[in-house]
């Protein structure tokens, strides 16, 4: 049973502030293509951390593909308090992360930074791969986690990059 941890840029990181942004159609097309390939490679579980942006878009696409491809979806939040201060629209998105096949919380609440380190280590040790929208030239807080992934023995990283999106956009506009 192959499991993939899903992580990537937030909507804010990408400057996408509307669910109707036309760039989302292209991003979701890339996600669908990647998820089809991952399913063919035997990935059956997708594990989320409950972040908005790339993770949420993967969740949306995976839920559409769930019946046909047999994906199982899990959300492992760092804290039970995750997202409690989000606005109503984001609370609705958070609820979708809670309506998956498996939901757990690592800790009741944040107490010290060691919890985040241990949480990340737990995620790495309990997944066999990751699906990551991240480009080293556009660093964010994911840089540290990405380094940990690269150092994890026998850990496969499937990355979606800006170059891939640009290539898809060129082909998309030609058709």
From Swiss-Prot:
Name listed for the protein in its UniProt record: UPF0398 protein SP_0371
Stated family: Belongs to the UPF0398 family.
Organism from which the protein derives: Streptococcus pneumoniae serotype 4 (strain ATCC BAA-334 / TIGR4)
Annotated InterPro entries: YspA (IPR010697)
PANTHER family listed in its UniProt record: UPF0398 PROTEIN SPR0331, UPF0398 PROTEIN YPSA
Transmembrane segments: none
Signal sequence interval, chain numbering: none
